[in-house]
Amino acid sequence: NKGIGLTFMTKYYNEQVETASRDQMFYIQSLALTRKIKQVYENVPLYRQRMQEAGIEPGDICSVEDLSKLPFTYKQDLRDTYPYGMFAVSMDEVVRIHASSGTTGKPTVVGYTKRDIEMWSECVARALVAAGTQKNDYIHVSYGYGLFTGGLGLHYAGELIGATVIPVSSGNTARQIQILRDFGSSVLCCTPSYALYIADTLREQGVDP
């Protein structure tokens, strides 16, 4: 997949969706929300219990304007249902698992279906194109590849665009700088603080970033 009609110097990855009118977006979001509420009510015991306690049924959620009717989900809920208790599909449909670092307790676990990965990749592709990324770019990914979703999300998004992805991953700043120079990277994907650190390191080497 080389993108949806993506050509050089385009502003959109999926122009039809990204330029939808407010009314069209309201309809798209509301339709997706009502389907998702029905799915989690039927498949996630905690969500069903919370909605019943609040006197809410799936049919009461008709649009995004009804979001305020829904009860909150708390961090402790994710810990109490660790690892798979919040999944709304069977494990047979889960093709990948990502998770937070768990620095404050148990990690937050997210299961991805094949469709989830496709949707996530397109969402990130839209963001990359909106930031100016094109098919002829070399994308240097400095996010970690592992349980954190950042590296892989950007990796697959870059491939959807049709750009060349360089999966450097995190750490070893000297190596990062060498690859940025030698491979002709034109897009750097990393945290803002790490981009500044790379710039500072270059200045220390007498190079204007």
Region locations from a protein language model:
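Conserved adenylate-forming
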Residues: 35, 46, 152-209
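Conserved AMP-binding loop of ANL adenylate-forming enzymes
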Residues: 129-163
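Short glycine-enriched loops at secondary-structure junctions
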Residues: 94, 117, 144-146, 193
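Nucleotide 5′-phosphate-binding alpha/beta core
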Residues: 1-99, 104-122, 129-130
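N-terminal Rossmann-like NAD(P) cofactor-binding module of classical short-chain dehydrogenase/reductase
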Residues: 98, 140, 189
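Short acidic, glycine/Ser/Thr-rich loop/turn "cap" segments at secondary-structure junctions
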Residues: 105-112, 136-143, 180-184
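Conserved ATP-dependent adenylate/AMP-binding module captured primarily in the ANL superfamily
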Residues: 121-138, 172-185
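Short, flexible loop segments at the rims of nucleotide/cofactor-binding pockets, characterized by
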Residues: 116-117, 143, 163-168
